[in-house]
Curated annotation (Swiss-Prot):
GO terms for cellular component: cytosol; glycine cleavage complex. Belongs to the GcvP family. It holds the Pfam family GcvP2_C. The keyword Protein transport does not apply. CDD domains: GDC-P. The keyword Oxidoreductase applies. This is Glycine dehydrogenase (decarboxylating). GO terms for molecular function: glycine binding; glycine dehydrogenase (decarboxylating) activity; pyridoxal phosphate binding. The modification N6-(pyridoxal phosphate)lysine is found at K708. It catalyses: N(6)-[(R)-lipoyl]-L-lysyl-[glycine-cleavage complex H protein] + glycine + H(+) = N(6)-[(R)-S(8)-aminomethyldihydrolipoyl]-L-lysyl-[glycine-cleavage complex H protein] + CO2. One of its GO terms (biological process) is glycine decarboxylation via glycine cleavage system.
Length: 957
């Protein structure tokens, strides 16, 4: 035998599973681009002064099986107590048909945000269903397709209230004293940067306060009390005060819709509809508002439109509100939402339907009534007479009760003076209620569930008659058909087939890093040890989570060159916001709070200026030179002009133009010279890992898109994770939390997310990726990502000019193809090429970002040479088709490009085009055919005729 045992053990086996091209394919591509090796190619492209001498020490790679075993041992340290803590988080029963066919299905979780609606009709339909659930339960006119979490939704509601308020001089926002504490925490953080004063008081005292533009009430208070705010809301509306109401989605099944009571905005968490607690997330928030406020709403909105043939089709509506277009004037900086989680909640509602949901809600309420009756029968007092699922129980021996609860492996809410909180949920059984009787009353309580049930069934007064819903919900056919598992399975599959995800083809979106989300990485997120923990459980019950998070943070520190990492931000946009707040608070700590100017290159992603605006900064744009790099002369001039008011610069590296700028260190030095901080956007970290690092380059803070570089899937538009890495001087200024002390962080800052560790339950994905790749694999992944991009650029540059290149004519991990000359010559646009790619079985590259009239391509390291060649061949074939238009063979108004994409129905319809059906749907011998279900969307029609609820089922099936 010539191989050693170590070689046969092959601990680095996963590296070859993750990286698409094998060694032979890599060498072929290296030959094609004129480089001898990966190291030689990297050496040519990356500036020498920022190349790391040694790779970060994150350990050797592990096999999939070894890594899973190691993580399972860590997860086993978590203690799975039954949690009745509530506070917006409850245990759930995720229907197995949804678990298997959506959450564990790459056809759903590997898709991208539906910017290309023709390849996204399935999840757009599921999101439209989510909006319909929201509309029915809230009683309002317009709903979004999810926000990041309930607390973030509250902050967005405050910001929206100010935007639509007619009280322009009012600057105070009132929050009822019984909202969830984590909600208040995030609202306060946002209010500080906007300059709003937050008033917290009993809701009935709101009218005592002057100069209030908006009010936040909670329909079911944090300790369980149901409020009838009808009269109060009417009085507030008479004073032109915008009213927002936080609501419990399961309670809304039984309770009066806040919209019917006059609320302007209603929001809450959809977690109870089938999404595990997961130590805090990810969870989708729902958000609804009156129709008159629709253009001021944050987040995605799915609308019903028409395609080119006049058929009903769905799309993301009113995108001109969003950050990628309006930049600092956007309604919100949100880029990622929580699509996968919203779709789970949506399908939970479809599967159970109105009858099933009412049964679940009534069962929860009945068990709560039984628990209340038994406790009161034995002399215990309840703080509130009206409740849905949560009791606030006064106890004389609170310490004894909590001790008995711990012995029974039960968590009660313990932060209420002289009382405990108990929140029941859909997993609660009669046996659980008997156990709670024993904890609160002792084992000899003598209570009987059936006897108590008869009592409360005939005389339940715990929901005020005026608060009981009197209208029907979820009457649309989609919520009343798919209740057998067979029907549900087929419905979900029919939606999946309409979409294009990574399980069918590469998604070469520039700046999005649509790499492999390996099965081994995904497996741990459904382990009950991770899925079932309450985010506010005692820390000793979450030792496994703490170990995993600490280890992941340590690896990220080493990979970024920073000194600390904060895991709280639950999206890249939230990470930007948190990082900028750290800079702001750092300056304030040095009595330099006047520093509020943020320099942003003209090429920046739209979230950058939107986040800067949210952080209370003024945006000053820095020009780029003819090569697409930051103009150093303009940078110096702008920095000098800002002077003592310079707060920071936000820069992406490699640049959004797909180039390693040679002067990046000089950029950092100029900003530091004038007292500013350097925020390095982590969007393109996939071209840095193992090769260089933000800290080594000279940056002070970055967010990391774990849903790009570190393999968390995009989920069709979320979830994401955007933890921030910081240098030591900024560490005291990262987000904290009002409920949970974050170990190792000395920060006293407010929170940016509802949960202390953001979407903690998806962090195992990134842990697994780093553990299986090791230092060697991570560097190689970056190098192959660079190789793949240069291979595409070199093969396509004669057909489609590459707009920007660096030294030696190379690109980084992505390249921009300039379509503008072709459009001038032929009239064929980047949009036509993008839609024609669908006929070839591909998702389009990023269109018109960062430069209008271009396509930005990022292949990632996970795509094999075979797939790259398939894409290249498709692009070259499209170029040949453009030449046919140029030569007059096909007219500009009727050719395969302007009519793309083509659908199956066209094959059997009358055919009057100057090209054949075969050219239309099987171009260049396409073998593995993806069939879109709609033709090109009519965007103008969709925005002019905004309709954001379910249409008759016959129209989109």
């Amino acid at each position: 035998m010539t191989q050693t045992l170590s070689q046969l053990e092959n601990s680095g086996a996963f590296i070859e599973r993750h990286i698409g091209p094998d060694a032979a394919q890599q060498q072929e591509m290296l030959n094609a681009v004129g480089a001898q090796s990966l190291n030689a190619l990297t050496g040519q492209i990356v500036p020498k002064d920022i190349q790391l001498a040694t790779p970060p020490q994150v350990g050797a790679p592990a096999t999939e099986y070894a890594a899973l075993a190691e993580l399972k041992a860590i997860a086993s340290r978590n203690k799975r107590f039954t949690s009745y803590i509530g506070m917006g988080y409850t245990a759930v029963q995720l229907p197995p048909v949804i678990l298997r066919n959506m959450l564990e299905n790459p056809g759903w979780y590997t898709a991208y945000t539906p910017y290309q609606p023709e390849v996204s009709q399935g999840r757009l339909e599921a999101l439209l269903n989510f909006q319909q659930v929201t509309l029915d339960l809230t009683g309002l006119d317009m709903a979004s397709a999810s926000l990041l979490d309930e607390a973030t939704a509250a902050a967005e509601a405050m910001a929206m209230a100010k935007r639509v308020s007619k009280l322009k001089n009012a600057n105070r926002f009132f929050v009822a004293s019984d909202v969830h504490p984590q909600t208040l925490d995030v609202v306060r953080t946002r209010a500080e940067t906007f300059g709003f004063e937050v008033i917290v008081d009993d809701a009935q005292k709101v009218l005592d306060h002057q100069d209030v533009f908006g009010v936040l009430l909670q329909q079911v208070g944090t300790t369980g009390e149901i409020h009838d705010y009808t009269t109060l809301i009417s009085e507030l509306k008479s004073r032109k005060i915008v009213v927002s109401v936080a609501a419990d989605i399961m309670a809304l099944v039984l309770l009066t819709a806040p919209g019917k009571q006059g609320a302007d905005i209603v929001f809450g968490s959809a977690q109870r509809f089938g999404v595990p607690m997961g130590y805090g997330g990810p969870h989708a928030a729902f958000f609804a508002a009156k129709d008159e406020y629709k253009r001021s709403m944050p987040g995605r909105i799915i609308g019903v439109s028409k395609d080119a043939a006049g058929n009903t089709a769905l799309r993301m509506a009113m995108q001109t509100r969003e950050q990628h277009i309006r930049r600092e004037k956007a309604n919100s900086n949100i880029c990622t939402s929580q699509v996968l989680l919203a779709n789970i909640a949506s399908l939970y509602a479809v599967y159970h339907g109105p009858v099933g949901l009412k049964r679940i809600a009534n069962r929860i309420h009945r068990l709560t009534d039984i628990l209340a009756a038994g406790l009161q029968q034995k002399g215990l007092k309840l703080r509130h007479a009206h409740y849905f699922d949560t009791l606030c129980v006064e106890v004389a021996d609170k310490a004894g009760v909590l001790t008995r609860a711990e012995a029974a492996e039960i968590n009660l809410r313990s932060d209420i003076l002289n009382a405990v909180g108990i929140t029941l949920d859909e997993t609660t059984t009669r046996e659980n209620v008997m156990q709670l009787f024993s904890v609160l009353l002792g084992d000899n309580h003598g209570l009987d569930i059936d006897t108590l049930d008869k009592d409360v069934a005939h005389d339940s007064r715990s929901i005020q008659p005026a608060m009981l819903r009197d209208d029907e919900i979820l009457t649309h056919p989609v919520f009343n058909r798919y209740h057998s598992e067979t029907e549900m399975m087929r419905y979900m599959h029919s939606l999946e087939r309409k979409d294009l995800a990574l399980n069918q083809a590469m998604i070469p979106l520039g700046s999005c890093t649509m790499k492999l989300n390996a099965a081994a990485e995904m497996i741990p997120i459904t382990w009950p040890e991770f899925a079932e923990l309450h985010p506010f459980c005692p820390p000793e019950q979450a030792e496994g989570y703490q170990q995993m998070i600490a280890q992941l943070a340590d690896w990220l520190v080493k990979l970024t060159g920073y000194d600390a990492v904060c895991m709280q931000p639950n999206s890249g946009a939230q990470g930007e916001y948190a990082g900028l707040l750290a800079i702001r608070h750092y300056h304030e700590s040095r009595n330099e709070g006047h520093r509020d100017i943020c320099l942003i290159p003209a090429s920046a992603h739209g979230t950058n200026p939107a986040s800067a605006h949210m952080a209370g900064m003024q945006v000053v744009v820095v020009a780029c030179d003819k090569n697409g790099n930051i103009d150093l002369t303009d940078l110096r001039a702008k920095a000098e002009q800002a002077g003592d008011n310079l707060s920071c610069i936000m820069v992406t590296y490699p640049s959004t133009h797909g180039v390693y700028e040679e002067t990046i260190r000089e950029v950092c030095e100029v900003v530091h010279q004038f007292g500013g901080q350097v925020y390095l956007d982590g969007a393109n970290m996939n071209a840095q890992v193992g090769i260089t690092s933000p800290g080594f380059i000279g940056a002070d803070v970055s967010h990391l898109n774990l849903h790009k570089t570190f393999c968390i899937p995009h989920g069709g538009g979320g979830p994401g994770m955007g933890p921030i890495g910081v240098k030591a001087h900024l560490a005291p200024f990262v987000p904290g939390h009002s409920v949970v002390q974050i170990e190792g962080m000395l920060t006293r800052q407010g929170a940016v997310s509802a949960a202390p560790f953001g979407s903690a339950s998806i962090l195992p994905i990134s842990w697994m990726y780093i553990r299986m790749m090791g230092a060697e694999g991570l560097k190689k992944a970056s190098q192959v990502a660079i190789l793949n991009a240069n291979y595409i650029a070199s093969r396509l540059q004669d057909a489609f000019p590459v707009l920007y290149t660096g030294r030696d004519g190379r690109v980084a991990h992505e390249c921009i193809l300039d379509i503008r000359p072709l459009k001038e010559e032929t009239g064929i646009s980047e949009l036509d090429i993008a839609k024609r790619l669908i006929d070839y079985g591909f998702h389009a590259p990023t269109m018109s970002f960062p430069v209008a009239g271009t396509l930005m391509v990022e292949p990632t390291e996970s795509e094999s040479k075979v797939e790259l060649d398939r894409f290249i061949d498709a692009m070259l074939a499209i170029r040949a088709e453009i030449d046919q238009v140029k030569a007059g063979v096909w007219p500009l108004e009727d050719n395969p490009l302007v009519n793309a994409p083509h659908i199956q129905n066209e094959l059997v319809a009358e055919w009057a085009h100057p090209y054949s059906r075969e050219v239309a749907v099987f171009p260049a011998g396409v073998a593995d055919k993806y069939w879109p279900t709609v033709k090109r969307l009519d965007d103008v029609y969709g925005d002019r005729n905004l309709f954001c609820s379910c249409v008759p089922i016959s129209e989109y099936q």
